Amino acid sequence: MPKVQVVNMQGSPVGELELDEYVFGIEPNTHVMHQAVVGQLASQRRGTHSTLLRGEVRGGGRKPWRQKGTGRARAGSIRSPLWRGGAVLFGPKPRKYGFSLPKKVRRLALRSALSSKVNEQKLIVLEDLSLNEAKTREMVKVLQALNVSKKALIVTDEFMETIERSARNIAGIKTTAVEGMNIYDLLNSDVIVMTKAAVTKTEEVLA
């Protein structure tokens, strides 16, 4: 079973934690992770693009000139797709891009992402994370003590307003509860900072 060091808010080690191998120690499935990321990003697309078809463009009901005798190419409408200001053939229409993956696949993707972070030694487990007040400088002190200077995802066992408000003004830092954890944020972060309680809850949810 994989083990990680547990540290306090000052960055000092306070013990070790054995991780559930089924959640944090599997062979990462890159194909499933890719599918999950594509699905998440696709569901975020607005899909509001729209073009006008032949029947939707205003005007163009009258034949612009007679069929023969003018020396010009024949034309039946000034709203032909060939004309400037004309219709669009096979253009985009509003649609939903999102697609759903089976629950087992989504969970496998999350387990793969967490396992890859453990393999890369990019998972930091905090004994506890509690701030007296929602101040950015308080969170900065904690991150500096943990040597976190890049993009990081802070995961707590439940939503904590003081943590969220303390971190939201720090560039590259995101916070989430275990229930809100998603594949894109996990893979897009250089470091994952999880509380000990969050690790336990994650194992309960994904095991």
Swiss-Prot record:
InterPro entries: Ribosomal_uL4, Ribosomal_uL4-like, Ribosomal_uL4_dom_sf
Region (Disordered): 56-76
GO molecular function, one term: rRNA binding
Summary of the function given for this chain in its UniProt record: One of the primary rRNA binding proteins, this protein initially binds near the 5'-end of the 23S rRNA. It is important during the early stages of 50S assembly. It makes multiple contacts with different domains of the 23S rRNA in the assembled 50S subunit and ribosome.
Matching HAMAP family: Ribosomal_uL4_B
Similarity field: Belongs to the universal ribosomal protein uL4 family.
Name listed for the protein in its UniProt record: Large ribosomal subunit protein uL4
Protein source organism: Desulfitobacterium hafniense (strain Y51)
